[in-house]
């Protein structure tokens, strides 16, 4: 008898033009939100674990993409003014870690990083929604 896959928790990330990285102080604009929305709805995106200690153990450089460690997938995306809301399914054993959203570069961005806010603990329905945008980076050829 095949074993069942682990239940997935879901969380919603809000990407806003007023979001500020508490470390770098980087802001982004409404066009970035629109580009991200177009990308996610057309191609989807995945979330990767960026735990530095795990990366070091696996010998992955900090600036190197960790392609084989996708841990979640986008379920839906909708835009409300300058706020992009993206819902992801994520294994419930992974909550509370630093996450990064990656997508194909067609939409004009490479990476969006989310950081846990508060405890990031799933509720009784398995939902984790205590994540917020940390920063977004753009492809250099779009300058």
Where are these regions (language model features)?
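Short, flexible beta-strand-to-coil junctions
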Residues: 16-20, 51-54, 117-124
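Residue microenvironments linked to proteolytic maturation
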Residues: 73-143
């Amino acid at each position: 008898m095949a074993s069942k896959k682990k239940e997935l928790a879901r969380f919603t990330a809000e990407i806003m033009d007023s979001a500020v990285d508490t470390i770098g102080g980087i802001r982004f604009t409404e066009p970035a939100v629109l580009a991200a929305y177009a990308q996610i709805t057309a191609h989807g995106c995945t979330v990767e674990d960026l735990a530095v200690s795990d990366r070091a153990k696996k010998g992955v450089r900090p600036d190197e993409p960790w392609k084989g460690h996708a841990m979640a997938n986008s379920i839906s995306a909708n835009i409300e003014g300058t706020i992009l809301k993206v819902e992801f399914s994520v294994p419930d054993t992974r909550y509370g870690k630093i996450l990064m959203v990656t997508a194909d570069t067609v939409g004009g961005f490479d990476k969006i990083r989310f950081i846990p806010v508060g405890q990031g603990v799933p509720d009784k329905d398995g939902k984790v929604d205590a994540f917020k945008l940390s920063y977004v980076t753009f492809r250099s050829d779009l300058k």
